[in-house]
């Protein structure tokens, strides 16, 4: 049976046109005239060399000129949520410890269970609120400093931590502001030092050589 008969081709074209699947046919002579300049010899089906598609590290889909690192605003949600959950977990453990300590002379009964549960709930909420508030202030200051300076580095971290401590302890007067600022400065400086420890070690080793 000859499948190249015009009638059979017309029948297939008619069915294809009915169901919307019809497509024009191309002969080998038509395809032979298509230019293949610029195509890779490794893959005739791509207009780029597949070797350029192999990446040694992770790549992100970003607009041209965009920064690959997440900014302060993107990290703020993770920071605030993580601090709230960490504070709740720490407060629950601390409340459990305090509850057992305060009820150690009581017999194991329902009032003892209620008192321990109340202590766990109270301490969990207290620590979650405290750490969440600190994270909110730190993130807000970090975003403001980043937008003002137009850069994201360890100086933003230290400045945001110092200002957070100062504002959080502002109700204690000038002495409280100074203590809060020093505490924030110390914590964020230690964090920045930890993040850059490998770089500092590498720089010191190169200088020693």
Swiss-Prot record:
Q: Which GO terms describe its biological process?
A: protein import into mitochondrial matrix
Question: What Pfam families does the annotation carry?
Answer: Tim17 (PF02466)
The entry's keywords: Membrane, Mitochondrion, Mitochondrion inner membrane, Protein transport, Translocation, Transmembrane, Transmembrane helix, Transport
Say yes or no: keyword Lyase present.
no
Q: What transmembrane ranges does the database entry give?
A: 73-93, 125-145, 180-200
Q: Which InterPro entries does the record match to this protein? A: Tim23, Tim23-like
The record's Gene Ontology cellular component field reads: TIM23 mitochondrial import inner membrane translocase complex
Q: Which molecular function GO terms apply here?
A: protein transmembrane transporter activity
- Taxonomic superkingdom: Eukaryota
Asked whether the keyword Transmembrane helix is assigned, the reply is yes
The way this protein sits in the membrane is described as: Multi-pass membrane protein
Q: Which compartments is it annotated to reside in? A: Mitochondrion inner membrane
What is annotated about its quaternary structure and interactions?
Component of the TIM23 complex at least composed of timm23, timm17 and timm50. The complex interacts with the timm44 component of the PAM complex.
Functional summary from the UniProt entry: Essential component of the TIM23 complex, a complex that mediates the translocation of transit peptide-containing proteins across the mitochondrial inner membrane.
Which family is this sequence assigned to? Belongs to the Tim17/Tim22/Tim23 family.
- UniProt name for this protein: Mitochondrial import inner membrane translocase subunit Tim23
Q: Which organism is it from?
A: Xenopus tropicalis (Western clawed frog)
